[in-house]
Design a protein with these regions (language model features):
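Short helical patches
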Residues: 187, 191-198, 205-208, 212-213
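Gly/Ala-rich hydrophobic membrane-inserting helices
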Residues: 1-3, 135, 203-213
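Intrinsically disordered, low-complexity coil segments
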Residues: 150, 183-186
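Small-residue helix-packing and pore-constriction motifs in hydrophobic alpha-helices
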Residues: 1-34, 41-52, 58-71, 79-150, ...
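Residue-level recognition of alpha-helix termini/interfacial anchor residues
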Residues: 122, 184, 201-202
């Protein structure tokens, strides 16, 4: 429950809206439960995307798309979120960014070539000329991860492997304990407050107990 509470507070602070934060949190919990990534990976990616300026309603869908690519190429999800977010804040693609995508095995140049109706070797010239904006990169990511795309549905497919199922079971257990903790939050908080009082006032409590004896 503690981990969930921290995430809930973090999203409420970032969004300034409890309802939006709760909606996003429920989406992320479900995504973690049906993909090979754990809740912490998914939540960290969500926080990064929000910090880069992604709207709350688009965060989970974007994470799923980036997660499909990350799962397909066995690269860290947050690494790809960083690269995507950096391109978004720059509002265009630079040569070094294209190289970073390509270096990770992401066929971005191929997708951009299709978009612009040019050969792959001409994409670099378009990037250098500043003609490839973030919307084009976003469209390329969507094309790669739509149903039937190169990476479409890979996270869900990987979640059916033994490793993926173990990760999903761990997330399900965390979710179960969170629900139990939420239902008993008042009791737990009172218990913790009582324990804190005992620790902070152990000398006073000790004297009282000695007097009783």
């Amino acid at each position: 429950r503690g981990e969930f509470q921290q995430l809930e507070v973090a999203f409420q602070t970032m969004l300034g809206n409890k309802e939006q934060a709760d909606t996003l949190m429920s989406q992320l919990v479900r995504t973690a439960a049906i993909t090979p990534f754990n809740l912490q990976d998914v939540a960290n990616g969500a926080k990064q995307l929000l910090a880069y300026g992604t709207e709350a309603k688009d965060v989970n869908d974007t994470l799923v798309r980036l997660g499909d690519i990350a799962a397909g190429l066995s690269i860290p999800l947050n690494d790809l979120v960083w690269l995507y977010g950096t391109t978004m804040t720059q509002e265009r693609l630079f040569t070094q960014d294209l190289r970073q995508f390509m270096g990770r095995g992401i066929p971005l140049a191929d997708e951009l070539a299709k978009q612009f109706g040019v050969t792959k070797d001409k994409v670099g010239e378009l990037v250098t000329a500043g003609k490839v904006g973030f919307p084009e990169v976003q469209k390329a990511i969507e094309s790669m991860t739509n149903e039937g795309g190169k990476f479409g549905g890979l996270m869900e497919a990987q979640s059916k492997t033994i490793t993926g199922q173990i990760s999903n079971i761990e997330d399900a257990i965390d979710t179960m304990f969170n629900k139990i903790g939420k239902q008993n939050e008042g009791v737990i908080n009172k218990t913790l407050s009582g324990m804190s009082y005992l620790v902070e006032n152990y000398e006073k409590v000790g004297r009282v107990l000695t007097g009783l004896v």
